[in-house]
Amino acid sequence: MTNSTTCRGILGLVAATFMTPVMAQEQEPTFLDEITVTSTKRQSTLQEIPVAVSVLQAADLKESQILDVKDLQFLVPSLRITQLQSSGNTNFIIRGFGNGANNAGIEPSVGVFIDGVYRSRSAAALNDLPNLERIEVLRGPQSTLFGKNASAGVISVVTAKPSLDETSGSASLTVGEYSQVLVKADVNGPLSDTVGFSLSGSFNQRDGYYDNLAGGDALGELDRFGVRGQLYFEPSDEVNVRIIADYSKLDEACCGVANLLNGPTGAAIVALGGNLVPNAPFAYQGYYDFTPVNEFESSGVSAEFDWDINDMMMLTSITSLRKLERFENGDVDFTSAPLLDPSTGNRTDVDIDTFTQEFRLSGATDTASWMVGAYFFDEDVTQETGLIYGTAFRAYADILTGGIPGTSPLWDIENGLTGLFLGGLPSLGSVVPGGTFFGEGQGNIEISTMDNKAFSLFGQIDIDLGDRTTLTLGANYTEDEKDVTFNQTATDVFSGLDLVEVGGLLIYGAVFQSEFASNGGDPVAANAVASATSAALAPIPCSATNPPPACNPSLALQPLQFQRPNINFPNSVENGNTKDDDTTWTVRLAFDMTDDVNVYVGAGTGFKASSWNLSRDSRPFASDLPALGSAGLLVPNIVAGTRYASPEESTVYEIGLKASWDVVSLNLALFDQEIEGFQSNIFTGTGFSLANAGKQSTTGAEIDIRWLPMEAFEATLAATILDPKYDSFPGGVGVSGPEDLSGTQPPGIHELSLTATGRYSFNIGNAAGYARVEYIYEDEVQVIENVPASVASREVSTINASFGLAWDNGFEAMLWGRNINNDEYLLSAFPSVAQAGSYSGYPNQPRTYGLTLRKYFD
């Protein structure tokens, strides 16, 4: 489907929508409900606010079986949420912009706020959602009101406040496929005339749907627990205080990975006695020699204070303290061969402590409403990572280098270096016994810390220019400072070898031995000839026109140096510090054409501070290598890379229309959005490449329609059309390695995404019933830039449905099914770990269904 065809289709829908009020007047159905919006830090309605925002209300979330933030993408086409190799590595993307997974030093571009409190990492927002009023998704840069981490958009989760009027509650039980059991309960009510409370809890357990044929737990399971308590104080009409405390825990085996293309390394896995399921993306089966571990604990407390100083002014304070602990250990080769140590093979242990404080002063006059505020953010991150070889990695490396244990080039190097040392020639300074390289227990361990402090000053004013025209002006000044430390312990002997030097030594030694025999055992004569001859042979670089063994043959083994040693910092050259500041702004003009239709035009900017690479792939910039050498800090076989990515700055220009009649509403946004310095983090098969794209832009349109053609039926359509492009990305990563991606289309961004729903309500006896169907479509797109589109493309065509009954006594029953047509698509893809020529990917969840029973009481 072309963009022009899609645009014509949507314009036809818009035209039909404008005709609808005339027909609706004849049928006289019920009116559309008014939808509240508070994510802009003041209360308004969806149709009045001149901002591109999607609002999901509690009833929609319940009927759609939305259990955590990841499920929101099925109802908001502009939102994409992708889970990667663990439960907490999740990317949030709006309009094609966003990142933040796979590295604790990379903050998200989409800010997630729960009851006004920022969740700095996606793992802290993935618990089962508590009692909800609504979820609001602000599309486009929102840094004017939200600061440094809203350059692509904001997800605002609003939960119900405790009641001061009456006690109420509910309890529910869900049973579903894969032995799922979900229990939820809550109670809400007054403790006195001025104090209310609420308490809610949930337990969610489900077996995995991705079988481990090597034994052990199936992957893709759920095992979650959460509890949340609130106190609400209203000592007077002018003052109220809301205190929230929450705790959640997750312990799951996640996530199933499929072999998309079995390259030549697959034979090596089989030769070692290992297994894999080749070329089968949707078999939902694999081989793992140990079960992945995903453990999370998230807890926090917040206090919101509101004071109506007078009829024209209000003070708000929101204080929060949060803690996130995350431990992961996964079998990243995704085979049953014991290439990694099962206890510490590929582990990540992260602790994050976050404190935030926001003050807002807002007010209104006859001709304007205004708000000023300040925000402070203080976060400490401690991370320990490790990648440790298992019992079979040496044999695997021997096979990959074309030999068998005892005869491969790795053994030749070990024996050659040992001979050089024993012969008194220049060497690495120690004997290298056979079997040293890739020994069990070798690897790297990294410990990183990051102290991040930031503050913002912001303000916004809405000025009435007349009865129907409003001008909005806003600005935000943000400062962000990060202090980072990195310390690595490297025991991977082979990765620490400089193969340029090693190759020269081996050639020198071979020439010396030959000349020693030719000169009758005279070492002086042999040394003179060997020195002159070996200089002409090595170590010259290898290239396409000068491949091994014509040049230094040892260089052909560099792809096996998965874990090259690093340089710890801070040091005398790298201070481990970034300081960023930026002023973002918003300007918008809104005009009420009629009482039912308003239009707006606006522009705004967003900002995201520098992101640090807190992983084994954090390496000094090439520009710092000379100074590091002069300071004597270089280590053998060091390579350049990136320590951090510089800030990204976004700009959007937008035109919108919002219309609401009795039975139909229409919201339309046309936008042109770009990000300078987009922070890209791509997995290359042995590590991650963190880099700034010069510029990424997207032109697009978004449309939301709600329609009640009759009292018993409601239909919705939400669609997003995007035309994305890397305007400049010379430092990108393609299928063959480093590549200039300028002028290409970013992968994973669908040109067309839409969600259509239909809901029919009816009565059966004394029960009110409904039937709801959802259809989600996303057109075909390459999944990721460094995996060929022929191997990993994605097209979505999914159907969800639910059927429910509610009785007057507060009892409800709901049958639900997700992906009932068993649609198959990839969530993401990547070059297989240490398996050149092979590709892997994450398949979507297959069809699930279940029954929910719920009882309300008061």
Placement of each model-derived feature along the sequence:
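Acidic, small-polar-rich N-terminal luminal/periplasmic segments of exported/outer-membrane proteins
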Residues: 29-164, 655
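Outer-membrane beta-barrel translocator/receptor signature
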Residues: 90, 107-109, 121, 130-139, ...
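Outer-membrane beta-barrel proteins
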Residues: 122, 174-182, 205-236, 240, ...
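Periplasmic-side early beta-strands and strand-to-turn transitions of outer-membrane beta-barrels
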Residues: 156, 165-166, 172-174, 186-290, ...
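Signature of Gram-negative outer-membrane beta-barrel scaffolds
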Residues: 214, 376-594, 629-633, 640
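Membrane-embedded beta-barrel scaffold of Gram-negative outer-membrane proteins
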Residues: 304-308, 314-320, 324-332, 592-608, ...
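Gram-negative outer-membrane beta-barrel transporters
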Residues: 369, 467-471, 665, 670-675, ...
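C-terminal beta-signal and adjacent terminal beta-strands/loops
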Residues: 387-394, 712-715, 776-784, 805-858
